[in-house]
Design a protein with these regions (language model features):
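Helix-to-loop junction immediately C-terminal to a conserved catalytic motif
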Residues: 54
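Conserved catalytic motifs of ABC-family nucleotide-binding domains
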Residues: 161
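The feature captures the beta-strand-to-loop junction immediately N-terminal to the Walker
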Residues: 39-41
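Conserved ABC ATPase signature
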Residues: 140-144, 148
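Conserved ABC transporter NBD signature motif
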Residues: 62-73, 81
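Hydrophobic anchor residue at the start of the ABC signature
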Residues: 154
Length: 170
């Protein structure tokens, strides 16, 4: 399993008067078992870059490959890629939307085709892994503290058992 970017550039508002270049000819390869940190100043393109890893953003030019396959090719399974490349956003609490913690964390596994029972089991394992107490499972995530919300959001991605986990300053 590998993730590879070749000469990836990205422009916000391409072709408009507000065109802003965010990435310029980025080359990067991440292989199984590697830990990679991307550092830079605010506004340097870190979040934009990682959104290319699972196809949330499409390169203006260049190519992104997952396991040797170009993710921009017709017929490439982007939905499957998003299950394999889990992304926890910079403000993970903005990822929460369900009426209870357990339902929120079950969302990903259910969308991967798990039964309700399987999804609940995966959700409980992920919540325990990040230290969310069982008495919070039926609470609305919006009543939790900021730190608890972040843990729940991270659990939601971990419950999908991604091959690659991307953390954008969670």
């Amino acid at each position: 399993m590998s993730l590879k970017l070749e000469d990836v550039s990205f422009v916000y508002g391409a072709g408009t008067s507000s065109e802003t270049k965010a990435l310029n000819n980025v080359n990067l390869e991440i292989n199984k078992g590697e830990f990679v940190a991307i550092i830079g100043h605010t506004g340097s393109g870190k979040s934009t870059l990682i959104q290319h890893f699972n196809g949330l953003e499409k390169a203006t030019s260049g190519n992104v490959y997952y396991d040797g396959k170009n993710i921009a090719d017709k017929g490439f399974d982007i939905r499957g890629l998003r299950c394999k490349v889990g992304l926890v956003f910079q403000y993970p609490e903005h990822q929460l939307f369900e009426e209870s913690v357990i339902k929120d964390v079950c969302f990903g596994p259910l969308n991967q085709g798990c039964t309700k029972e399987q999804a609940i089991e995966k959700a409980k394992e992920a919540l325990q892994l990040v230290g969310v107490r069982e008495e919070l499972y039926e609470k609305t995530p919006f009543e939790l503290s900021g730190g608890q919300k972040r843990r729940v959001a991270i659990a939601g991605v971990l419950a999908m058992n991604p091959e690659i986990l991307i953390l954008d300053e969670p």
